């Protein structure tokens, strides 16, 4: 008995990663210029800022790591209570592709060393909160 080989090639799905978003909560008044100057683990050409948008982009291998000031969106009384209780002065949305997580961790280590703070979930109650070891 002869078995015929299936000539159709099976498609191998490539993991493209997932875009995730957190809030980087910082206990100091920090601008995107401050953020970009604190990051040394990537080439200067990979970093770009838009001061008028208060936005920083770092081009990584799968996608970009983007920090955008979101302080003006935390206007609800519950938000204000959370920020005050945690001593947060500025909030940046941080979005990145999960395929870049190792480099994102290096960037976050540099930012945490320079400014402190923590990452909060993009959820209604901002929980859970993540420390650098969680990345």
Model-derived segments and spans:
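Short, intrinsically disordered low-complexity segments
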Residues: 12, 26-99
């Amino acid at each position: 008995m002869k078995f015929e080989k299936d000539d159709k090639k099976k498609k191998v799905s490539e993991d493209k990663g997932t875009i995730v978003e957190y809030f980087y909560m910082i206990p100091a008044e920090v601008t995107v210029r401050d953020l970009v100057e604190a990051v040394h683990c990537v080439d200067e050409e990979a970093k770009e800022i838009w001061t008028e948008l208060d936005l920083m982009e770092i081009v990584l291998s799968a996608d970009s790591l983007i920090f955008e000031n979101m302080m003006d969106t935390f206007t609800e009384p519950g938000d204000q209570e959370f920020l005050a209780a945690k001593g947060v002065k500025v909030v940046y949305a941080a979005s990145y592709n999960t395929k870049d997580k190792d480099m994102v961790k290096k960037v976050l280590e540099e930012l945490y060393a320079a400014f402190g703070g923590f990452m909060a979930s993009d959820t209604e109650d901002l929980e859970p909160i993540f420390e650098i070891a969680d990345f």
